[in-house]
């Protein structure tokens, strides 16, 4: 139809040939691909009905025809969907069995109050189908009270029918009256608050109002859904005539037909929606009644997806107010488990750690007499550390998994080579059956001498833990700053979520940077999305070029910052725009304070204090500095002996708390 193409074809033979070839291949499939869950069934061998194709990347046979051609060839196509959620449910049920709680998930009550309270409060992190922020917002508005509400929401939450969610919620909650379309069909739409939601409703309306058979109603639905104009033109007079015979006037019948035509285009199959809703309800029921087993089941399915595990950790601690036991070679299993109403972190969830190696640790522990390792040397004797590998062992140390055996992680990390050699010697001796005459193999081998090193500071432990786990688990870098942040009017994420419900808020927030993505606008201006965490959760802040220019050097992973933000709420989702940012030690510095006084009870403690101060003096990330004085309080002396150590040492809440943890330090005071 394009005149210029016609002219080009007349002028050049090659263009004419190209257009001729193009017309022949236009509309044909460009590649062979397979549906993830599509299976075709025929009444005879498939090669007698359709051409087949062997995918070179698999052993699977596929048809060369597309979906529509397959159906026209007389084959029936089914989609057999496999859901990871079914594994989540089975994981949770298996964990419940370990404490003799046997549940037939297919026969649970469908009117459990706790489950619908969970839905209505939108506490649906990890609940199938309803964990997105949009779904959570819809749940808060709908306040579901029955399984039919969940079925309807699954069907409505798609482009097109989504616009009917507000009307459904308003009618359900009595804010709006249900509008009658026609008395003949009101009962059909009662369960969906007067809105056509399902394909089955389209068929039933055609059957009841216009006298269609079920087969005829299905043909009508298909014609409407696929917008087949010829079929629609043929169906309208048939529908009008049938409706008239049932006493429906022509105008109303035409209105209903138009309504059916509109909704049939995106009406959802009710049985499909119901199947998904039941699975959603089962996950919600498990979360409402057995939250730890459910969350452990979820986390076992996302073992190495750090971003998801971080969200689930936040949900367990801050959402469900339950506890997580950090990785521990004496308590943890290969996967996530539940004991004594606590979720035990999985050994395999650490970075660079495999399940086979962790199973060796668990097996050795269970074979021991006490069912636990007493110290790192017993671990070396019972577990062939060489088979675990140095990298996984390092991650176990960094995560604190050996803390019950030796709490000095820096010592263990530097001593791993000698421990692995010790373990190898013992196990080699066992293999060669050269054990001593009267004892176990290896008892005559001397235990290696461990390195002598200072313990990591609490802040260093968290950094190393983050390397191994992917997020902060046993604590948070801002824990030491809690009182200082409160004193300076800094708001937590949890508090900000509450404040913003009443409208936009200007506030100060503090957090540890975990990630950053830089972008450019259409005009070439820079902006960034920065991911930040505080002890109450995770959040994202948007920064535009003016703020980036002045604070970019602080916006790197691991840095603690204070931000002035403008907070708003969109569809129940917190939006933060940063107006200013600075390092936490700069933001919280108290200019009225000169420094610290460290009170100790013996001269021996002084060297430990000096060692710590020397270590933190090298920390470039600590911006506040001041004097440090040592005060020796000894009962044998008439008074305090004060010694000025220096006038420019790093001073911040993390340093203060690290000093307080030193044995022999009585107190630390600012002055």
Regions found by a protein language model. Name each.
Residues 1-671:
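Noncatalytic, beta-rich nucleic-acid-contacting surfaces in large DNA/RNA-processing enzymes
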